[in-house]
Amino acid sequence: MNQKPTTGLSQNQIKLIAAAAMVIDHVGVELFPQLTILRIIGRLAFPVFSYCICEGSRLTHHPWKYFFRLFGMGLLCVIGYYVYTGMFYGNILITFSLSLCVLYAFQHLQTCWSQDKITARFAGVGIMLGCMAGIWLICRWITIDYGFFGVILPLFAELSACIWQRYAGADGKQEPARVLGFSVGLLVLSLQMGGIQIYSLLILPLLFAYNGTRGERNLKQFFYWFYPVHLLLIGLVSMWI
């Protein structure tokens, strides 16, 4: 990924904005539940991280290492939440882990479809449909943050980019199409969830301003540990108050 200075916002910049929104959201949940504005601000976080999962699935050199790192951190949070509340909850990292499975299945489908073999194409379609069906069942049996539509949200971006490249003849410049497809998916998710989730659409101008670069500093470890650490700190504060 090109790291030279460009106009627009880097991935690190939009993720830091999303991280701040997430902290505000969780502070609202635990400490100030009467302040709806904090929850509204928090709606800006999920779309950014979901879109970055889409980016990460394409750019990582170690796909399954990426998955297991994310899933492992999510599982750690699931255990912590169960110890704290006595309830099982599939947090946002579990959602994103399942999103990666969908995206990897779609990438495999694209590889199979590029082969001039009917068996390979059928295999790719079968794996994709099986993955989608399996995740739908998981979301039916277990409470997963943002549900099935939240899991498949990044897929809207990849589908849009694929269609753009195939039919519009885009010369590798798929980012606007990717964000546009993601916007459609986010609208579907917002309408499906209802309530204040519609405010998540306010983040779209920032996503359209994304310049396709990661940023000058490597903040990967920070973002991996940010989620469990900030939840732990907010939980401790709520216990003391």
Regions picked out by a protein language model, each given a short descriptive name:
Residues M1-I241:
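Alpha-helical transmembrane segments and their immediate juxtamembrane cytosolic regions
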